């Protein structure tokens, strides 16, 4: 830790305090995440350290790079590249009545998908994607932060400040208690973020797991074994769920064109096996008119 100087506290993440810091010799500005674990006495589990060490190898222009993993007083510090703005702050800064430029929505979505495809190809899931952990710079680049931390540390129910971890971007298979889930959980999250890029509003903003599920069901219809084989046997599925009929996504997401809505609907398919993959999403006609500079990144 002696290599880094803490400059100021910049936020509170899912796992602990985040500081802006500086490397003593190079002067490089970094983000320092202090990981606060549930069981402080036992120190950091070796499995977590193994998992985290693997993340140093995830090098991609759309992934926030993990530069160092340090221990101090049995606390774990993760040293990341520094970006000052996250997508939530950016969306909140857009004046009322105005929206993000549609070409920027497209560019950000494409970059998010590129980052996710890279990680999925290395068998790393994110599991907790949300606007707060998508970081942006002033050159139009967006990067995914906190990759792989969910697997290393688990996703707590509450942030250590007692703020509840958001459910708004969580996939239906996770909400319904599926024990086996894979890369489609991240695609669902990206779909909900895509809608929010277009409208500035969360697509499904539930305040409990059941409220979250019912908001999804009201928009997309209550799933059954016909549309999603075996959904009725998932741990938290109840036959007593109200049977809503599918509505139209267009009524919830007014600022997307036909191709955008088509891609969104493919990302929000109930059956994870039928949900579009990141790789296929990148080939969708929605991106046909995207600037080639972005496609080459």
Curated annotation (Swiss-Prot):
Phosphorylation at Thr-14 or Tyr-15 inactivates the enzyme, while phosphorylation at Thr-161 activates it. Activated through a multistep process; binding to cyclin-B is required for relocation of cyclin-kinase complexes to the nucleus, activated by CAK/CDK7-mediated phosphorylation on Thr-161, and CDC25-mediated dephosphorylation of inhibitory phosphorylation on Thr-14 and Tyr-15. Activity is restricted during S-phase in an ATR-dependent manner to prevent premature entry into G2. The keyword Nucleotide-binding applies. Gene3D superfamilies: Phosphorylase Kinase, domain 1, Transferase(Phosphotransferase) domain 1. Keywords: Acetylation, Apoptosis, ATP-binding, Biological rhythms, Cell cycle, Cell division, Cytoplasm, Cytoskeleton, Isopeptide bond, Kinase, Mitochondrion, Mitosis, Nucleotide-binding, Nucleus, Phosphoprotein, Serine/threonine-protein kinase, Transferase, Ubl conjugation. The active site is at residue 128. It is found in: Nucleus; Cytoplasm; Mitochondrion; Cytoplasm, Cytoskeleton, Microtubule organizing center, Centrosome. Transmembrane segments: none annotated. Phosphorylation at Thr-161 by CAK/CDK7 activates kinase activity. Phosphorylation at Thr-14 and Tyr-15 by PKMYT1 prevents nuclear translocation. Phosphorylation at Tyr-15 by WEE1 and WEE2 inhibits the protein kinase activity and acts as a negative regulator of entry into mitosis (G2 to M transition). Phosphorylation by PKMYT1 and WEE1 takes place during mitosis to keep CDK1-cyclin-B complexes inactive until the end of G2. By the end of G2, PKMYT1 and WEE1 are inactivated, but CDC25A and CDC25B are activated. GO terms for biological process: apoptotic process; cell division; cellular response to hydrogen peroxide; chromosome condensation; DNA damage response; epithelial cell differentiation; fibroblast proliferation; G1/S transition of mitotic cell cycle. CDD domains: STKc_CDK1_euk (cd07861). ATP binds at residues 10-18, 33. The modification Phosphothreonine is found at residues 14, 141, 161, 222. The modification N6-acetyllysine is found at residues 6, 9. The modification Phosphotyrosine is found at residues 4, 15, 19, 77. Induction: Follow a cyclic expression; during interphase, accumulates gradually following G1, S to reach a critical threshold at the end of G2, which promotes self-activation and triggers onset of mitosis. Induced transiently by TGFB1 at an early phase of TGFB1-mediated apoptosis. Expressed during S-phase in mitogen-stimulated hepatocytes. The modification N-acetylmethionine is found at residue 1. There is a cross-link at residues 6, 9, 20, 139 (Glycyl lysine isopeptide (Lys-Gly) (interchain with G-Cter in SUMO2)). One of its GO terms (molecular function) is protein serine kinase activity. The modification N6-succinyllysine is found at residue 245. GO terms for cellular component: centrosome; cyclin A2-CDK1 complex; cyclin B1-CDK1 complex; cyclin-dependent protein kinase holoenzyme complex; cytoplasm; cytosol; endoplasmic reticulum exit site; germinal vesicle. Residues 4-287 form the Protein kinase domain. The modification Phosphoserine is found at residues 39, 178, 248. Belongs to the protein kinase superfamily. CMGC Ser/Thr protein kinase family. CDC2/CDKX subfamily. Plays a key role in the control of the eukaryotic cell cycle by modulating the centrosome cycle as well as mitotic onset; promotes G2-M transition via association with multiple interphase cyclins. Forms a stable but non-covalent complex with a regulatory subunit and with a cyclin. Interacts with cyclins-B (CCNB1, CCNB2 and CCNB3) to form a serine/threonine kinase holoenzyme complex also known as maturation promoting factor (MPF). The cyclin subunit imparts substrate specificity to the complex. Can also form CDK1-cylin-D and CDK1-cyclin-E complexes that phosphorylate RB1 in vitro. Binds to RB1 and other transcription factors such as FOXO1 and RUNX2. Promotes G2-M transition when in complex with a cyclin-B. Interacts with DLGAP5. Binds to the CDK inhibitors CDKN1A/p21 and CDKN1B/p27. This is Cyclin-dependent kinase 1. The gene is Cdk1.
């Amino acid at each position: 830790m002696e290599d880094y100087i803490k400059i100021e506290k910049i936020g509170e993440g899912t796992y602990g305090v985040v500081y802006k810091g500086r490397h003593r010799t190079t002067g490089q500005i970094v983000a320092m995440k202090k990981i606060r674990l549930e069981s402080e006495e036992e120190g950091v589990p070796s499995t977590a350290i193994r998992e985290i060490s693997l993340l140093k190898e995830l090098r991609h222009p759309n992934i926030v790079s993990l530069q160092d993993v340090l221990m101090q007083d049995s606390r774990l510090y993760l040293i990341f590249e520094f970006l000052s703005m996250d997508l939530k702050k950016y969306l909140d800064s857009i004046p009322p009545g105005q929206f993000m430029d549609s070409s920027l929505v497209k560019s950000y979505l494409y970059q998010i998908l590129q980052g996710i495809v890279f990680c999925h190809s290395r068998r790393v899931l994110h599991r907790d994607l949300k606007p707060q952990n998508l970081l942006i710079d002033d050159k139009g680049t967006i990067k995914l932060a906190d990759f792989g931390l969910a697997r290393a540390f688990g996703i707590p129910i509450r942030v250590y400040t007692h703020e509840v971890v958001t459910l708004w971007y969580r996939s239906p298979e996770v909400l319904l208690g599926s024990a086996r889930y894979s890369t489609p959980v991240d695609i669902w999250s990206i779909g909900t973020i895509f809608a929010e890029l277009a409208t500035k509003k969360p697509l499904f903003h539930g305040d409990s797991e059941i409220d979250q599920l019912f908001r999804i069901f009201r928009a997309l219809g209550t799933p059954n074994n016909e549309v999603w084989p075996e959904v009725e046997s998932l741990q938290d599925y109840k036959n007593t769920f109200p049977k809503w009929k599918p509505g139209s996504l267009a009524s919830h997401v007014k600022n997307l064109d036909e191709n955008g809505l088509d891609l969104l609907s493919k990302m929000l398919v109930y059956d994870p096996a039928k949900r579009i993959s990141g790789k296929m999403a990148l080939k969708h006609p929605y991106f046909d008119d995207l600037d080639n500079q972005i496609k080459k990144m």
